[in-house]
Regions:
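Sec-dependent N-terminal signal peptides
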Residues: 1-3
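C-terminal motif of bacterial Sec signal peptides marking the signal peptidase cleavage site
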Residues: 7-10
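Ser/Thr-rich, Proline-interspersed low-complexity disordered segments
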Residues: 12-47
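A surface/extracellular/periplasmic glyco- and lipid-processing/surface-interacting theme
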Residues: 46-92, 96, 101-361
Length: 361
C-alpha cells in the first residue's frame, strides 16, 4: 500500500520550471560633448605713465625726482683723423660740445644709470661744463680739473661734502682699458652705471632733487619741426678752435647723425651712429687762451644770446637765456614763445659768433 503511494507520486505530472529572472539591460552612458578649452585672457600691457624729463619720452619709471648724471668725455682724434673711441654716446639723453684749449670736449647727461654700459674716455672738467651740469642739478663725474674748473667747483660748492663732484679714477669708480680701441692710460678712463651707483652709496650722494617738480626748462612735442623754418638737411658747426662737427638729417632714423673729422660719429659700445632729434647751436662770448695753459672761458649763465634750433630737417633762429648758476637754460622760438623740442635726444653746442658759428642748407 505504501509502495503504491510512492509509485503514484512518481507518476504525477512534471512541474513547470520557474521562469528565469530577466538580465538587466546595460545602462547606456551618454558620450560627453567635448569641452572647449577656454582662451586665456590676455594680460593688458601697462601703458607708460611717466615722462623722461630730459627726452620727453614715455617711460615706466618716475624720474621726476631723480638727479641726472653728467660725465665729462674726451672728443678728439689721432693724427690720421681716426676718432678716439667714445663709449656711452647712445645711452646719453643730452650731449654737450664746447671747446677746451685747441679741441672740444663732450659732456654726456644720463637720466638713468641702471644698465649703463662703459662710459669712456673720461677726462677733466672745465668751469663752463660744471655750470651746465648745475643747470640740471646733476651729479658731475670727471677725471681731473683745470685750475679754473677747480676754483669754480669749489666756489659753487660742488665738492665731496655734498658728494656732487665725483672724481673718477682707479681708486674710486673708474678703471682703465689698455687694449684697442681704448689706447692706454690717457684715453681709457672708464666707468659704468653699476660702479657709479656703488660710489654714490659709499659717499652718501644725494640722488634726488631737493625740491619737488624740478624744472629743467625743457618742453617737448611730438612734432617739433619749425613750421616756417628753412631747409636744413645738413649743417656744419665750426668752433673757435676750428674743430668742425657736421650733421645730416636721416629721415629713416628721424634725427641728425654726425660726422667728425670726416668719420661717422659712433658709440664704440655698439659700433653704430646716433641720431639726435634736436640740435641746438647757442652763441656765447668765448675767450680763448685766458692763461698759460690756453684755457677758455664761455658764458653759460647770467647771460642771454641768439642761436639756432634744428629738427626734422628744418632750422629756426632762437634765443636762449639763463639766470643764476643753479637755474635752468631757457629757450625761445622766433615768435617769443617757449621752444618746443622734439621727443628724443638733444645735442647742444656753444659757439662764438665771431670765431666760427653754424651754416646749413
Amino acid at each position: 500500500m505504501f509502495a503504491c503511494l510512492i509509485a503514484a507520486a512518481g507518476c504525477g505530472p512534471t512541474p513547470s520550471p520557474a521562469p528565469a529572472e530577466a538580465s538587466p539591460s546595460p545602462a547606456v552612458t551618454a558620450t560627453p560633448e567635448p569641452t572647449a578649452t577656454p582662451e586665456p585672457t590676455p594680460t593688458a600691457t601697462p601703458e607708460p605713465v611717466f615722462i623722461n624729463p630730459l627726452t620727453g619720452e614715455q617711460t615706466y619709471t618716475d624720474y621726476s625726482q631723480t638727479r641726472p648724471v653728467a660725465v665729462m668725455v674726451e672728443n678728439n682724434c689721432w693724427d690720421d683723423g681716426t676718432l678716439i673711441a667714445q663709449g656711452g654716446l647712445s645711452q646719453a639723453a643730452i650731449v654737450y660740445e664746447m671747446q677746451v684749449e685747441s679741441i672740444t670736449r663732450n659732456m654726456f647727461l644720463f637720466m638713468d644709470t641702471d644698465g649703463l654700459n662703459n662710459v669712456f674716455p673720461i677726462r677733466s672738467a672745465r668751469s663752463y661744463f660744471v655750470s651746465a651740469a648745475l643747470s640740471y642739478d646733476a651729479i658731475f663725474a670727471h677725471c681731473g680739473k683745470s685750475a679754473e674748473g677747480l676754483e669754480f667747483a669749489d666756489t659753487m660748492l660742488v665738492n665731496y661734502t655734498d658728494a656732487d663732484d665725483i672724481e673718477v679714477h682707479e681708486g674710486s669708480c673708474g678703471f682703465r682699458q689698455y687694449e684697442a680701441p681704448y689706447f692706454g692710460a690717457v684715453h681709457s678712463m672708464t666707468t659704468t652705471g653699476e660702479r657709479l651707483q656703488s660710489l654714490f652709496a659709499q659717499y652718501g650722494t644725494r640722488t634726488t632733487h631737493r625740491t619737488d617738480g624740478y624744472d629743467y626748462g625743457l618742453r617737448f612735442t611730438d612734432d617739433a619741426a619749425p613750421v616756417n623754418g628753412e631747409a636744413a638737411g645738413s649743417l656744419r658747426i665750426v668752433f673757435p678752435t676750428n674743430k668742425i662737427t657736421e650733421f645730416a638729417y636721416d629721415a629713416e632714423k628721424g634725427g641728425y647723425t654726425s660726422t667728425q673729422w670726416y668719420r661717422d660719429y659712433t658709440d664704440a659700445n655698439t659700433g653704430e651712429s646716433v641720431a639726435f632729434e634736436n640740435v641746438l647751436v647757442l652763441y656765447s662770448p668765448t675767450a680763448v687762451g685766458i692763461d698759460v695753459k690756453n684755457h677758455s672761458s664761455i658764458y653759460t649763465y647770467d647771460y642771454q644770446d641768439a642761436g639756432y634750433f634744428f629738427n626734422g630737417g628744418y632750422a629756426e633762429p632762437i634765443t636762449w637765456s639763463r639766470g643764476g648758476v643753479n637755474e635752468p637754460f631757457r629757450y625761445y622760438a622766433s615768435d617769443g614763445s617757449e621752444l618746443q623740442l622734439g621727443v628724443g635726444k638733444t645735442y647742444i653746442a656753444f659757439v662764438s659768433e665771431y670765431y666760427g658759428g653754424v651754416s646749413y642748407s
